[in-house]
From Swiss-Prot:
Subunit structure: Homodimer.
EC numbers on record: 2.2.1.9
Reactions accelerated catalytically: isochorismate + 2-oxoglutarate + H(+) = 5-enolpyruvoyl-6-hydroxy-2-succinyl-cyclohex-3-ene-1-carboxylate + CO2
Keyword Transmembrane helix: no
Gene: menD
Pfam families: TPP_enzyme_C, TPP_enzyme_M_2, TPP_enzyme_N
Gene Ontology MF annotations: 2-succinyl-5-enolpyruvyl-6-hydroxy-3-cyclohexene-1-carboxylic-acid synthase activity; magnesium ion binding; manganese ion binding; thiamine pyrophosphate binding
Enzyme class per UniProt: transferase
Name this protein carries in UniProt: 2-succinyl-5-enolpyruvyl-6-hydroxy-3-cyclohexene-1-carboxylate synthase
One annotated GO biological process: menaquinone biosynthetic process
Organism from which the protein derives: Shewanella pealeana (strain ATCC 700345 / ANG-SQ1)
Entries under CDD domains matching the protein: TPP_PYR_MenD, TPP_SHCHC_synthase
């Protein structure tokens, strides 16, 4: 058992870990206070290659790291102490695993002799995240374990890893070095060359994409009437290339809220509502072939269309090998980046422009929305459309789960520019949305808007403390309809059950919550007041909260009314 210079050796291992993570592409480290993680915290504090983010709540910290990783397109490290601090990361780790976001959890832990014996703040941490993280269990630091073994273990665990990795780090006390600097030169001699350079100790080649279709396969696939579906796509996948592909083939491209193309004028963004419309549905029923880029489609009607149609050919393009089709249709799955697949030598379809009428139907719905949403009573869809119209390519838009993202999917406007759109639709929880948006905003300092419901905001209220640290414009728009009013859209057996067990009206406002964290706040109940407040907030360097107060049934009644008009059009 190693006892001499324990604190110093603990810190040395922490320093090696943080240095190698920086070399492996980590740019941000998120830390929560705690004693058992001290070797990691002290190492991170002096690591100049990493931006440090501190928060007292590990659940919010995990989601902040998720947002940082989404927006920076790089792995993010999280440091926590032992015990339930680690467990609080679970929701964020699940979301990251499902959506292939690389988080690296570094958890401080008690040594083996203090586990399962009643020692304070000690739980069984290895494999705590089950299948949702790759697991690495480090022993307590020991001079008999060569530093190159530690470095190569980290390299293998993290290189080419697009999902979470949990590195459990056991440390014996003492944890706080107080001796003069200990000489570890002999111990570090095998990695002297590594110390003199900036590359990782072991370098693994990047994984290449899988087999691509031949020219003959492309020609056969485009023979006939087809549809392109842009599902969930990250900004770095360059989804705009799919617009060029659609124009080259002469096929319509229908777009999900998370595709980065929902507002594009050349796309069929109103597909959810068009599948309500008999003439559009009949036209789409003629399609023989489909190519889906991405997965996790939001619209149930679009999911149903893909499941019910008798496709001659069904292709799906995904960046990683996984199953992303709840209907389990027979298909060919290609592993490739969306923009690379779109840039193949595609010939023009033999049935080019077969669905041109769909473009007019899509535009007609936009006209309907302008009349019946933009110029109607103040409400949630009107607010979301107002925000969407004011986005540029240099901004981020994070859309919360439950009702906000569905309203955006159904009613987003057609515009010439739009923001980079972010969501948490892996597990689709309402937890951690505010913290994730803060991470998105902090990653690059781009102006960021968050649209979030009142229940989601209450769920993550203490992440307003994270928002305080954001120095770029961060506008938190809370749609307060006094409860979980997405349940108005669901077939709950009776209204009393809906009120008592689902909607959960709370009668709360967010002004005092914003004041508690020292954030600028405004409450609005008209579209003119909202636009004035929002446009000002987007010029403000820092976070602000706009609470939009709307009636409980406004959104659900408007959705039903518009659906009725669409069906009759």
């Amino acid at each position: 058992m190693q006892t001499e210079h324990t604190a110093e050796l603990n810190l040395l291992w922490g320093t090696l870990i943080l240095e190698e993570l920086a070399r492996l592409g980590v740019k941000h480290v998120c830390m929560a206070p705690g004693s058992r993680s001290t070797p990691l915290t002290l190492a991170a504090a002096k690591q100049t290659k990493l931006s440090q983010h501190i928060h007292f709540d590990e659940r919010g910290l995990g989601f902040m790291a998720l947002g940082l990783a989404k927006a920076s397109q790089a792995p993010v490290a999280i440091i926590t102490t032992s015990g339930t601090a680690v467990a609080n990361l679970y929701p964020a780790v699940i979301e990251a695993w499902l959506t292939h976001v690389p988080l690296i959890v570094l958890s401080g832990d008690r040594p083996p002799e203090l586990i399962d014996c009643g020692a304070n703040q000690a739980i069984i941490q290895p494999a705590i995240f089950a299948q949702y993280a790759k697991q690495i269990n480090l022993p307590t630091p020991d001079l008999n374990i060569a530093p190159q073994a530690l470095l190569s273990l980290l390299d293998e665990a993290i290189c080419n890893q697009s999902q979470p990795v949990h590195i459990n780090c056991m440390y014996r006390e003492p944890l706080y070095p107080n001796e003069p600097k200990v000489d570890f030169e002999h111990y570090l001699a095998p990695v002297k060359q590594w110390q003199q350079h900036t590359a990782p100790y072991s370098q693994f080649a990047n994984l290449t994409s899988g087999l691509m279709p031949t020219a003959d396969a492309l020609a056969r696939f485009v023979h006939g009437k087809g549809v392109i579906v842009a599902a969930t796509l990250a900004p770095e996948q360059k989804p705009e290339q799919l617009i060029e592909l659609a124009q080259k083939l002469g096929w319509p491209i229908v777009t999900d809220a998370q595709s980065q193309l929902r507002q594009h004028p050349a796309a069929i963004g109103n597909i959810d509502q068009l599948l309500h419309q008999p003439k559009s549905k009949a036209l789409l029923a003629q399609a023989e072939r489909v190519i889906v880029f991405g997965g996790r489609i939001l619209s149930k009607r679009l999911i149903g269309y893909l499941a019910e149609q008798n496709w001659k050919d069904y292709w799906q393009v995904l960046p990683q090998q996984q199953r992303l089709d709840p209907s389990h249709k027979p298909k060919k799955v290609w592993i490739a980046a969306a923009h690379q697949f779109a840039k193949l030598a595609w010939p023009r379809s033999s049935q080019a422009n077969w669905a041109l009428k769909l473009v007019q139907h899509n535009d007609d719905l936009e006209t309907l929305y302008q009349q019946q949403i933009d110029n109607a009573e103040f409400g949630e869809a009107q607010t979301i459309r107002a925000i969407a119209k004011r986005q540029t390519a240099e901004q981020h838009l994070f859309i919360g789960n439950s009702l906000p993202v569905r309203l955006y999917d159904m009613f987003a406007p057609i515009t010439t520019s739009s923001a980079n759109v972010f969501t948490n639709r892996g597990a689709s929880g309402i937890d951690g949305l505010l913290a994730t948006a803060c991470g998105v905003a902090a990653a690059e300092g781009k102006p960021t808007s968050l649209i979030i419901g009142d229940i989601s905001a209450l769920h993550d209220l203490n992440s307003l403390a994270i928002a305080r640290s954001v120095t770029s414009p961060l506008v938190i728009v809370i749609l307060n309809n006094d409860g979980g009013n997405i349940f108005n859209l669901l077939p709950v057996p009776n209204e009393q059950l809906r009120t008592d067990y689902y909607r959960l009206s709370h009668g709360l406002e967010f002004g005092f919550g914003a004041a508690m964290f020292g954030l600028a706040y405004n409450q609005v109940d008209s579209i003119s007041d909202f636009i004035e407040s929002y446009e000002y907030a987007m010029t403000y360097s820092g976070p602000s909260v706009i609470e939009v107060t709307v009636a409980q049934d406004q959104a659900s009644e408007q959705i039903a009314q518009i659906a009725s008009w669409v069906k009759q059009s």
